[in-house]
């Protein structure tokens, strides 16, 4: 007996039991996120960013991210939450891995349509927005907001 794939939930499959489904699609003003996994131990997403759009300038107090650029070119703006306003930029192309520990200020801008994978600790709402092109208000430091 077969069944249609369904959105995967927050809960991990029981030991020895596979979980088959479709990712949760989260529309964003800059593109979309496909949530592949979100458990109490880890999260995995694919982010698709439209050319010319960028995510918030942000940092996380607890969340640790690793990103893999699958396609396109992305301009990263990076800094430290301990040194406001001190940023450096670099362009990442397909095949690049970027590690963002807690406290790393970061922003990604798609120089062309781009897609990257993000594997992280599970704190998806741990975000402090410093700037945002889409008018989404950021919480003060120490309070959680919404991702991206």
Map each language-model feature to its residues.
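A short glycine-rich, His/Asp/Glu-containing loop-to-beta-strand
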Residues: 21-63
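Glycine- and acidic-residue-biased ligand/ion/polar-headgroup-sensing regions
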Residues: 62-81
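Short acidic-glycine-tyrosine-enriched beta hairpin
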Residues: 80-103
